[in-house]
A protein has these predicted regions:
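Generic recognition of short, well-ordered alpha-helical segments
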Residues: 4-8, 34, 61-65, 158, ...
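A cross-domain feature marking catalytic cores of carbohydrate-active enzymes
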Residues: 1, 25, 50-54, 82-84, ...
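Active-site mouth loops of central-metabolism enzymes
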Residues: 1-4, 53-60, 137-148
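Glycine-rich "substrate-gating" loop/helix at the edge of Rossmann-like oxidoreductase active sites
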Residues: 26-27, 53-58, 96-97
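Internal, glycine-rich beta/alpha segment that forms the wall or movable "lid"
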Residues: 64-181
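Short glycine-biased active-site loop of nucleotidyltransferases that positions the nucleotide triphosphate
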Residues: 40-41, 61, 134-135
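Generic structural signal for helix capping and beta-alpha/helix-loop junctions
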Residues: 30-31, 58, 87-90
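N-terminal beta1-alpha1-beta2 module of alpha/beta enzyme domains
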Residues: 1-50, 141
Length: 181
C-alpha cells in the first residue's frame, strides 16, 4: 500500500469493524513504524500490530525506543513483532547472521528487558553500553515473533507472547505450526 493511503485505509478498516490491523516491515517498501503511527493516529480504537521488524536490520535499543514511543502515544493499541526478515533482502544489505535464531532470541530478550526499564551493558550479537530507555511504556507490551520453521516456532513459544504466521499460511501449516509453538 502506498504510504499516503495508510490513514484512509486504517479509518475504513475501523469503520468496517475490523478487529486489528497489521503492518509488515518489508525492506525497500514503506517504513513500518511511520505507517503504524499514521494508522494509529487516524483511528480511535483499532489495535495495530507490527508483523514483523527484522532482528538483524534494527538494533534492539532502537526497536525498544520506537515500540515504547508508539505504546505511550497509543496505549494498549500497539503490538510489536520481531522476526529474522527475508533472507534475500538481508543479503542485499550484506547482512548474514551466523545464527539467525540466536539473533532473534537476543533481540527479543533485549527488547523485553529494555521495555521493562533495565539498563543494559553487555556484549553479544548486539552490544550495549549503559543503554536504558528514557520514556518507558506505561504498560507491558506483548511481543510477537514471526517465525516459519520448527526451531523458530519453538523459540516463539519460549520467548514470545504470540506468534505471527505468514499471510500465505494454509490450514495444514497452521495446525503443524501450533504443535511446535
Amino acid at each position: 500500500m502506498r504510504p499516503e493511503h495508510i490513514a484512509r485505509t486504517a479509518r475504513q478498516a475501523e469503520e468496517l469493524g475490523y478487529g486489528e490491523l497489521w503492518f509488515s516491515e518489508d525492506c525497500f517498501f514503506a517504513g513500518a513504524f511511520a505507517g503504524i503511527a499514521a494508522a494509529l493516529g487516524a483511528t480511535e480504537q483499532l489495535p495495530v500490530g507490527l508483523g514483523v521488524a527484522s532482528a538483524v536490520t534494527r538494533h534492539p535499543a532502537l526497536l525498544a525506543m520506537e515500540c515504547a514511543t508508539l505504546s505511550r502515544l497509543y496505549p494498549g493499541r500497539f503490538w510489536p513483532g520481531i522476526g529474522l526478515g527475508v533472507p534475500f533482502w538481508l543479503q542485499q544489505m550484506g547482512l548474514k547472521p551466523r545464527s539467525p535464531l540466536r539473533a532473534v532470541r537476543e533481540c527479543t530478550t533485549s527488547l523485553r528487558r529494555l521495555l521493562g526499564g533495565e539498563e543494559l551493558t553487555e556484549q553479544g550479537l548486539f552490544a550495549f553500553d549503559a543503554v536504558q530507555l528514557t520514556h518507558l511504556p506505561e504498560e507491558e507490551l506483548p511481543i510477537y515473533l514471526g517465525m516459519v520453521g520448527p526451531k523458530g516456532l519453538e523459540l516463539a513459544g519460549e520467548v514470545a507472547d504470540g506468534t505471527v504466521l505468514s499471510v500465505l499460511a494454509g490450514v495444514e501449516y497452521v495446525r503443524w505450526a501450533r504443535e511446535r509453538i
